[in-house]
Amino acid sequence: MTKRTKKAGIVGKYGTRYGASLRKQIKKMEVSQHSKYFCEFCGKYAVKRKAVGIWGCKACGKVKAGGAYTLNTASAVTVRSTIRRLREQTES
């Protein structure tokens, strides 16, 4: 393992290189891409990133397409809520 500090966290491996603001941006992306997410199918926190945009649940084995660094992108959440709203309007 590479040397890390409490403040730098996952980007401690970069040391003093690349500048503080770029390391902060990278830290946000790397923390989100390495964390576990909630599976909509089985209800467990077991979804992890397999590759860029491919997310798989270790509990139930489902594979889902998502964002590069997060499971759900902001635009996908907006589209999903819009579809749900339109579906409710047509049903009533």
Curated annotation (Swiss-Prot):
Q: Tell me if Ubl conjugation is a UniProt keyword of this record.
A: no
Q: Identify the GO cellular component terms for this protein.
A: cytosolic ribosome; ribonucleoprotein complex
| UniProt keyword Zinc-finger present | yes
Which keywords appear in this protein's UniProt record, sorted alphabetically?
A: Metal-binding, Ribonucleoprotein, Ribosomal protein, Zinc, Zinc-finger
Which GO terms of the molecular function aspect are on file?
structural constituent of ribosome; zinc ion binding
Instruction: Detail the disulphide connectivity of this chain as listed in its UniProt entry.
Output: none
InterPro entries xrefs: Ribosomal_eL37/eL43, Ribosomal_eL43, Ribosomal_zn-bd
The Gene Ontology biological process terms listed for this entry are: translation
Q: Which domain of life is it from?
A: Eukaryota
Gene3D superfamilies noted in UniProt: 2.20.25.30
Give the C4-type zinc finger regions: 39-60
Q: Which PANTHER family match?
A: 60S RIBOSOMAL PROTEIN L37A-2 (PTHR48149), LARGE RIBOSOMAL SUBUNIT PROTEIN EL43Y (PTHR48149:SF1)
Q: What family name appears in the similarity comment?
A: Belongs to the eukaryotic ribosomal protein eL43 family.
Write down the NCBIfam families for this protein, in alphabetical order: eL43_euk_arch, PRK03976.1
What is the protein named?
Answer: Large ribosomal subunit protein eL43
Q: Which organism is it from?
A: Gossypium hirsutum (Upland cotton)
